[in-house]
């Protein structure tokens, strides 16, 4: 995928870039693999805002992605299409299995239409195949990594991300995460060979506020621009500092404060903390 630039015939076009979508092979999603995605506006089931600055945006269909792939062990699948997914930064691949079933997976970098992929302990460690970590060679790059066997992929799912296998010890495999963290993951956890595709996504420049609104993002209001009743940083004549350590609207310290719980159960799996 390449990044497309524009002539500056308006101020917003000067900086704006888009994906050229050249790698896509299908426009409409597979109807049986989609479902409605109602908008929340950042509200919970009581109608209260639990996530600020969310609302509006283009209507979307949710594409049902197979993050497990365990139940298709030993069944060959052919890549029928590479598609756009509005719900994530990565592209998705439509698989046609030999038993007649169709499923979506995250499209790794380099996967093409017509390629054959497989899953399971007997699968070869080649691009697009999903297999337990104990069968992945040291040094290999993987994505869609499980943290709990059978739970489904949780790590390295965004565009361009990957995890590298660093070593193996008894029932665990040491992997390097995109954050730089070295972590032990159970060897029965599944991962897919290769890095997630659409790596150029990080170079996209929105260029104007309207494109953020199309994505369902509302303007992020600064606390210092509010009144004292609305935020601890608010008030004052003209532009004034917060006058205290940066805090959230609810008075909790923020901007650099570590929020990870002390003595968390998963601490024993972390070999080296993220940088």
From Swiss-Prot:
The keyword Iron-sulfur does not apply. Pfam families: Ribosomal_L2 (PF00181), Ribosomal_L2_C (PF03947). GO terms for molecular function: RNA binding; rRNA binding; structural constituent of ribosome; transferase activity. SMART domains: Ribosomal_L2 (SM01383), Ribosomal_L2_C (SM01382). GO terms for biological process: cytoplasmic translation. GO terms for cellular component: large ribosomal subunit. Residues 255-275 have a biased composition (Basic residues). Residues 1-20, 214-275 are annotated as: Disordered. It comes from the Bacteria. Belongs to the universal ribosomal protein uL2 family. Part of the 50S ribosomal subunit. Forms a bridge to the 30S subunit in the 70S ribosome. One of the primary rRNA binding proteins. Required for association of the 30S and 50S subunits to form the 70S ribosome, for tRNA binding and peptide bond formation. It has been suggested to have peptidyltransferase activity; this is somewhat controversial. Makes several contacts with the 16S rRNA in the 70S ribosome. This is Large ribosomal subunit protein uL2. It comes from Deinococcus radiodurans (strain ATCC 13939 / DSM 20539 / JCM 16871 / CCUG 27074 / LMG 4051 / NBRC 15346 / NCIMB 9279 / VKM B-1422 / R1).
């Amino acid at each position: 995928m390449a990044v497309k630039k524009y002539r500056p015939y308006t101020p917003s076009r000067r900086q704006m870039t888009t994906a050229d979508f050249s790698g896509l092979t299908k426009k409409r999603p597979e109807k049986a693999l989609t479902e409605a995605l109602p908008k929340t506006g950042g509200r919970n089931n009581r109608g209260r805002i639990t996530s600020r600055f969310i609302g509006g945006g283009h209507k979307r269909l949710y594409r049902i992605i197979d993050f497990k792939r365990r139940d298709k062990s030993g069944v060959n699948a052919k890549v029928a299409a590479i598609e756009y997914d509005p719900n994530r930064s990565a592209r998705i691949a439509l698989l046609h299995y030999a038993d007649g079933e169709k499923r979506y997976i995250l499209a790794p970098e380099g996967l093409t239409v017509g390629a054959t992929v497989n899953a399971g302990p007997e699968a070869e460690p080649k691009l697009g195949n999903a297999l337990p970590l104990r069968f992945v060679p040291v040094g290999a790059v993987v994505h869609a990594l499980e943290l709990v066997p059978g739970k489904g992929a949780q790590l390295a799912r965004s565009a361009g991300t990957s995890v590298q296998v660093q070593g193996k010890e008894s029932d665990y495999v040491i992997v390097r995460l995109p954050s730089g963290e070295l972590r032990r993951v159970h060897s029965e956890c599944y991962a897919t060979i290769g890095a997630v595709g659409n790596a150029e996504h990080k170079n996209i420049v929105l260029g104007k506020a309207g494109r953020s609104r199309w994505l369902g993002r509302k303007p992020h209001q600064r606390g210092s621009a509010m009144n004292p009743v609305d935020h601890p940083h608010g008030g004052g004549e003209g532009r004034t500092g917060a006058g205290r350590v940066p805090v959230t609207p609810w008075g909790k310290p923020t901007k650099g404060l570590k929020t990870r719980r002390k003595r968390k159960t998963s601490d024993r799996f972390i070999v080296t903390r993220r940088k």
